[in-house]
């Protein structure tokens, strides 16, 4: 797999892949106007020329959490495209004014069509974001060009303003395309329901009627009975979905992590093959700025809740509406669509009548919306499950509406449609609620159903264990596109599983999230789990005899545990963060570190003959002997696997125990409350009331005498994104930050 090019990649990836066919031919397809060569003339007020505009074509721009590929159009400007307009042709596009210019004067957007030396205005609209709040987001338009059908037509996108602008991003056109009613083109859809555990759906044997629409869909597709997610919360799971890589490889593991921009996602793979790519996403963990999941998408719509802000309550109806709108704007074009609803996620607030569908019902005294606040007695668990199931039933109804609309538009039969969950939800099966805390089956066993084009394999059920990483190669195979070979990806096309050509393999799942660190390796018959924090233990379950994972049989199966443990450790990717200790100011130090994981890659700088370090306890303990001199500090750095495993520090200086004032943490140089201490992590756990340690990746001032502690990125890695106040508040609303967490001091 090659490294991806500049993040704001242009439409040149698709050059030549989509040809505009005869205007009257029955095989005419839609055309992306951002293709190289279609733009023939550009006049911009900023003085930029055609060559410059072509370098900007396709750069992504975000307005109100909707990211589009764009064209710069500072008024006055004219962008001329030479095209053939097909019969039944439409021009679809977005247009908008970036937030930094919402206090400026209005801008008029105009579409002109020129043919035979005569230019005619086909559409216009004035945007005034200062006076009209509704204009502070992307606007969308669909212009019927049927009367201009034929060859040799010029489409001119023009902007006019009350004042000339030299800012190239003063106004923007987004994703302009010629679309064709009734044209046939390949279509791939991945429809993900956040927080949906497999055993609460009817195709997987649930006793309640939560998913009648999914049950119908199962009859038209294939049910994969043992589909396993690679993580127990959204970001790493969707990262594996988009890249077909394990979480440690794609690097979107913890809350502030960014999907590794050096990787190529499913969107980028398909975009390079001439597909238009769109997404409608309800979870801000995926669409927030800086997460990186929008790479490879022509349009990536983050859906807001009440108050037009990121919210924990974004109902599926709005997501489905946006998904259908995206399909409508790309008619007749090869299309990949990602849909991400999140109704089963806390809080459990299904709309009527689904809020009263299952007993025992919630009430004012027992609201049953969030187990973190509403669980007080055993009966509350049943109420919470009832509301969770109500959310599933509501979301299922919307999925049914989506499928019916695909059929009504004539899109369903030729499409590959993948339905899945990203992770599950727990209700005290192993002593906890919600998700992101372990890798037990209630969290990693997800529904996975695939409707193949032309009804192939309809009605089949597959017992062989598969994984979320298999979705990407399955989509490519269904579209008859090349499938990368391992190790570029870890997944296999599910078509090969159906044909019996792929033997069943184990699946790795891992979690390193807000103080919970664990990983596991699962086969269809057994499972190994290693927990590092807050529990520190090793578990083994016989899934045939104990599918609920209640009986730890590790002692009785030591050889099997050894084999699975070795498999996990071989698959784990090195931690990109390195813990660094700098000792300065003179004195004799003995520092002892221990971890629930294992220490690796120790590097020491400046050590003299009498200074050394030793590793003991099978890699779990590190002892360092240092004698720094004034002006001659010593540094020792090391990695910890898995990422997030706790590290504890204690030690002595000149024979006396270390005191808190001798230890300096990160850029602020704060002192711990006590020694021994648990070394700080990049992000806090539930009960942490302090702000995020944004500066953990910067060292304390070098002149501080004592032990200085901070984190460094391993070579070639980029630091995680600093969290904005808005992003912090949306993550807090979703429950990924504790209720007492303070976002007010962030920008």
Model-derived regions: residue spans:
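Accessible peptide chain termini
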Residues: 1-2, 737
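Bacterial N-terminal signal peptides that target proteins for export
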Residues: 2-13
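Bacterial N-terminal signal peptides
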Residues: 12-22
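Catalytic domains that recognize anionic headgroups
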Residues: 23-67, 72-747
């Amino acid at each position: 797999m090659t490294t991806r090019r500049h993040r704001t990649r242009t439409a040149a990836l698709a050059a030549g892949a989509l040809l505009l066919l005869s205007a009257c031919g029955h095989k005419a397809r839609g055309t992306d106007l951002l293709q190289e060569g279609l733009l023939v003339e550009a006049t911009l007020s900023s003085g930029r020329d055609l060559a410059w505009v072509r370098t900007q074509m396709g750069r992504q721009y975000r307005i109100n959490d909707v990211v589009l590929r764009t064209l710069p159009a500072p008024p006055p400007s004219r962008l001329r495209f030479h095209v053939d307009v097909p019969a039944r042709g439409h021009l679809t596009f977005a247009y908008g004014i970036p937030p930094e210019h919402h206090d400026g004067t209005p801008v008029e957007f105009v579409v002109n069509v020129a043919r035979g030396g005569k230019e005619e205005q086909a559409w216009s609209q004035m945007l005034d974001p200062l006076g009209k709040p509704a204009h502070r987001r992307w606007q969308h338009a669909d212009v019927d060009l049927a009367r201009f059908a034929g060859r040799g037509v010029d489409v001119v996108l023009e902007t006019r303003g009350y004042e000339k602008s030299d800012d190239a991003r003063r106004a923007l056109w987004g994703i302009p395309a010629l679309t064709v009613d009734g044209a046939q083109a390949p279509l791939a859809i991945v429809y993900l329901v956040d927080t949906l555990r497999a055993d609460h759906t009817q195709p997987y044997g649930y006793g309640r009627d939560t998913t009648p629409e999914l049950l119908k869909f199962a009859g038209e597709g294939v049910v994969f009975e043992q589909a396993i997610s690679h993580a127990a919360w959204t970001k790493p799971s969707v990262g594996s979905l988009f890249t077909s890589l394990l979480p440690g490889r794609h690097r979107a593991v913890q809350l502030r992590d960014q999907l590794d921009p050096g990787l190529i996602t499913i969107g980028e793979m398909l975009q390079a093959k001439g597909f238009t790519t769109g997404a409608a996403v309800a979870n801000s963990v995926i669409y927030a700025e800086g997460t990186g999941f929008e790479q490879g998408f022509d349009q990536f719509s983050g859906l807001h809740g009440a108050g037009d802000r990121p919210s924990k309550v974004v109902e599926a109806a709005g997501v489905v509406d946006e998904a259908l709108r995206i399909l409508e704007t790309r008619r007749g074009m090869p299309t990949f669509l990602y849909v991400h609803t999140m109704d089963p996620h806390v809080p459990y607030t299904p709309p009527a009548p689904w809020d009263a569908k299952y007993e025992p019902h919630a009430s004012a005294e027992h609201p049953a919306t969030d187990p973190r606040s509403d669980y007080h007695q055993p009966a509350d668990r049943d109420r919470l499950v009832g509301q969770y199931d109500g959310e599933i039933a509501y979301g299922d109804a919307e999925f049914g509406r989506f499928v019916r609309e695909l059929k009504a538009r004539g899109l369903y039969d030729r499409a590959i449609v993948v339905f899945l969950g990203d992770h599950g939800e727990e209700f005290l099966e192993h002593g906890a609620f919600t998700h992101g805390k372990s890798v037990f089956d209630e969290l990693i066993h997800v529904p996975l159903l695939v409707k193949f084009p032309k009804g192939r394999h309809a009605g089949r059920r597959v017992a062989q264990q598969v994984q979320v990483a298999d979705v990407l190669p399955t989509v490519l195979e269904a579209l008859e596109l090349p499938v990368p070979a391992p190790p570029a990806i870890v997944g296999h096309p599910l078509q090969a599983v159906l044909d019996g050509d792929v033997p069943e393999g184990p699946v790795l799942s891992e979690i390193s999230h807000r103080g919970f660190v664990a990983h596991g390796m699962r086969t269809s018959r057994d499972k190994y789990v290693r927990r590092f924090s807050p529990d520190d233990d090793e578990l083994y379950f016989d899934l045939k005899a104990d599918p609920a994972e209640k009986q730890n049989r590790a002692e009785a199966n030591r050889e099997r545990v050894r084999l699975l443990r070795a498999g996990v450790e071989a698959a784990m990717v090195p931690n990109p963060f390195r813990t660094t200790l700098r000792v300065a100011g003179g004195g004799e130090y003995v520092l002892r570190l221990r971890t629930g994981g294992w220490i690796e890659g120790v590097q020491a700088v400046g050590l003299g003959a009498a200074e050394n370090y030793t590793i003991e306890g099978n890699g779990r303990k590190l002892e360092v002997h240092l004698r720094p001199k004034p002006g001659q500090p010593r540094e020792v750095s090391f990695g910890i696997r898995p990422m997030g495993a706790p590290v504890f520090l204690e030690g002595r200086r000149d024979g006396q125990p270390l005191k808190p004032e001798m230890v300096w943490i990160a850029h602020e140089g704060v002192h711990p409350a006590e020694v021994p201490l648990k070394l700080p992590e990049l992000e806090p756990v539930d009960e942490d009331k302090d702000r995020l340690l944004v500066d953990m990746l910067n060292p304390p001032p070098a002149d501080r005498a004592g032990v200085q502690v901070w984190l460094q990125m391993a070579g070639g890695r980029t630091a995680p994104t600093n969290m904005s106040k808005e992003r912090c508040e949306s993550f807090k609303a979703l429950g990924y930050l504790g209720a007492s967490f303070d976002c007010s001091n962030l920008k």
